[in-house]
Amino acid sequence: RDRSVSRGLGDVYKRQNTGSKSEDVSAAAGETYKLEYTPTLKTYGFTEPVVLKAKPQRVVSLVHTPVLALHEMGIKQVAVPQAAMLEWPADLVKDAKLLNVSMNSNFDIETVIALEPDLVIVGYQSKDTYGKILDREKIPVYYVDAGHVVSYESIKELTDVLIKAFGQHNAGAEAITDRFNKLEARMAEKRQENKGQKVMVLQSAPPRHYIQGKDGTLGSMLNMLGYENVYQNNKMVLIDLEQALSYEPDLLFCVGGSKTAAEHQQVMEEDFAKNPEYWNNIKAIREREVIYLPIKYVATAGINVIDNINELIDIIDAKKLKQNG
């Protein structure tokens, strides 16, 4: 499949006639851009790298994860997915078409083909649907990890691949690497500090409250900060009220669909007030050891995970300061 991709690339460029002089020179010099597959994708059987004959000028991302990294490295995207959990940068959306690729939309891959992309980035689950059609059109496809929860590790792996392929001597790429390195150092420090502290994570749309383990979006962030999750299962389920009384977390984190933390706090406190006999049995609620978070902690969108974790650390630090102050 991948060999046909590099063959097909030539056709794409002939079809578009977009090659500038410098591109022709780099192609003539045999310079290629190689997208290796990440360790995660290799476990799903994607092994052959995607080789591009020239730096892509018309990328379509059907997944959120690569969008910000490509944007910061100056790689032009002609279409990106709509995003509920964050605002894309204004200078990205002024040139890029917003695609509704949510599960239930009747997304038509023909709209992508019409944009004449020179690279399409697709979730690995769509290999047999969108992938087949794009292959037939000889459009290069690169598959990535996708789904409701894309782990920090997975985002970091993909970003490393994109930097290797397109980020040589690139200030944007260097800045991203620097931010990851600073975050890693900060998280290592917090892991020491938070050792032995127990947390519970509720993802709620009252009156429904789901409990999240260490594999959820927020649960995994707290895990990387050294907290122990009281819920040892990795499947998010409706909270068992009886069982929850035995958990005794030091700190409760509440996340949901609200745009701001204050809005989510209001929604949750109204719900707690409907059944105070129950909720006040949980020490963290009784003693206000609760941190409320907005929708951006429900799902990540690529390298904004760096900002989200940094902000989470700041929020927790501010709460500790207030207590000790």
Question: What is each model feature region?
Answer:
Residues 11-65, 169-200, 314-325:
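Bacterial Sec-exported substrate-binding components of ABC uptake systems
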Residues 101, 109-122, 241-254:
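Proline-aspartate-enriched helix->loop->beta-strand connector
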Residues 1-13:
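Single conserved hydrophobic/aromatic residue that forms the stacking wall/gate
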Residues 153-178, 188, 194, 254-325:
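Structured C-terminal subdomain patch of bacterial secreted/periplasmic proteins
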Residues 62-115, 119:
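A short, structured surface patch at a secondary-structure boundary
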Residues 85-87, 211-237:
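Alpha-helical, coiled-coil/dimerization segments enriched in small aliphatic residues
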Residues 88, 127-131, 144-161, 196-217, ...:
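Extracytoplasmic ligand-binding site segments that recognize negatively charged/polar headgroups
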Residues 41-46, 96-110, 234-241:
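Short helix-initiation/N-cap motifs at beta->coil->alpha
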